[in-house]
Protein backbone atom coordinates (compact mmCIF):
# COMPACT_ATOMS: atom_id res chain seq x y z
CA UNK A 1 0.00 0.00 0.00
CA UNK A 2 1.30 3.42 -0.98
CA UNK A 3 1.34 6.11 1.69
CA UNK A 4 1.36 9.54 0.09
CA UNK A 5 3.47 12.44 1.34
CA UNK A 6 1.56 15.55 2.41
CA UNK A 7 2.54 19.09 1.41
CA UNK A 8 0.66 22.28 2.30
CA UNK A 9 0.26 25.49 0.32
CA UNK A 10 0.94 28.69 2.27
CA UNK A 11 -2.80 29.28 2.53
CA UNK A 12 -3.44 25.78 3.89
CA UNK A 13 -0.67 26.20 6.46
CA UNK A 14 -2.36 29.43 7.65
CA UNK A 15 -5.75 27.70 7.67
CA UNK A 16 -4.54 25.25 10.34
CA UNK A 17 -4.62 28.03 12.96
CA UNK A 18 -8.24 28.84 12.07
CA UNK A 19 -9.16 25.16 12.39
CA UNK A 20 -7.56 24.96 15.83
CA UNK A 21 -9.44 28.06 16.99
CA UNK A 22 -12.72 26.56 15.72
CA UNK A 23 -11.88 23.16 17.26
CA UNK A 24 -12.05 21.49 13.84
CA UNK A 25 -8.38 20.47 13.70
CA UNK A 26 -8.99 16.87 14.83
CA UNK A 27 -11.61 16.28 12.15
CA UNK A 28 -9.33 17.78 9.48
CA UNK A 29 -6.42 15.65 10.69
CA UNK A 30 -8.57 12.51 10.46
CA UNK A 31 -9.45 13.37 6.85
CA UNK A 32 -5.79 14.04 6.02
CA UNK A 33 -4.78 10.71 7.58
CA UNK A 34 -7.42 8.99 5.44
CA UNK A 35 -6.41 10.59 2.13
CA UNK A 36 -2.72 9.99 2.88
CA UNK A 37 -3.47 6.25 2.61
CA UNK A 38 -6.46 6.19 0.23
CA UNK A 39 -7.11 9.53 -1.50
CA UNK A 40 -10.12 8.22 -3.44
CA UNK A 41 -11.82 6.23 -0.67
CA UNK A 42 -15.51 6.68 0.00
CA UNK A 43 -17.06 7.18 2.49
CA UNK A 44 -16.62 9.96 3.34
CA UNK A 45 -17.63 11.21 -0.07
CA UNK A 46 -15.52 13.60 -2.07
CA UNK A 47 -16.21 15.93 -4.96
CA UNK A 48 -14.10 16.53 -8.08
CA UNK A 49 -13.72 20.26 -8.55
CA UNK A 50 -14.04 22.25 -11.77
CA UNK A 51 -12.92 25.65 -13.03
CA UNK A 52 -9.84 27.15 -11.39
CA UNK A 53 -9.57 24.09 -9.14
CA UNK A 54 -9.99 21.49 -11.89
CA UNK A 55 -8.05 18.37 -10.97
CA UNK A 56 -8.51 18.97 -7.25
CA UNK A 57 -10.86 17.23 -4.83
CA UNK A 58 -12.93 18.44 -1.90
CA UNK A 59 -14.06 16.72 1.29
CA UNK A 60 -16.33 18.24 3.90
CA UNK A 61 -14.78 19.19 7.26
CA UNK A 62 -18.12 20.62 8.36
CA UNK A 63 -21.05 22.35 6.67
CA UNK A 64 -19.01 25.51 6.06
CA UNK A 65 -15.41 24.35 5.58
CA UNK A 66 -13.80 22.03 3.05
CA UNK A 67 -10.50 20.20 2.73
CA UNK A 68 -9.36 20.90 -0.84
CA UNK A 69 -6.50 18.79 -2.15
CA UNK A 70 -4.74 17.62 -5.28
CA UNK A 71 -3.31 14.14 -5.81
CA UNK A 72 0.10 14.16 -7.52
CA UNK A 73 0.34 10.49 -8.50
CA UNK A 74 3.84 10.58 -10.02
CA UNK A 75 5.32 12.14 -6.88
CA UNK A 76 3.04 10.09 -4.59
CA UNK A 77 2.13 13.35 -2.89
CA UNK A 78 -1.08 14.97 -1.68
CA UNK A 79 -1.03 18.77 -1.98
CA UNK A 80 -3.38 20.38 0.55
CA UNK A 81 -4.67 23.56 -1.09
CA UNK A 82 -7.13 24.82 1.52
CA UNK A 83 -8.69 23.82 4.83
CA UNK A 84 -10.88 26.84 5.54
CA UNK A 85 -14.01 28.28 3.89
CA UNK A 86 -15.94 26.92 0.96
CA UNK A 87 -13.80 27.51 -2.15
CA UNK A 88 -13.05 31.19 -1.47
CA UNK A 89 -9.53 31.98 -2.62
Labelled PLM ranges:
Residues 33-59:
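A short, surface-exposed loop/turn module that caps and links secondary-structure elements
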Residues 2-18, 22-29, 50, 59-66, ...:
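Enriched for short, Lys/Arg-rich terminal
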Amino acid sequence: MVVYSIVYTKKAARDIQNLKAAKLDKKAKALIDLIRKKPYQTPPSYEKLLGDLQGAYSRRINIKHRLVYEVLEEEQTIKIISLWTHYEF
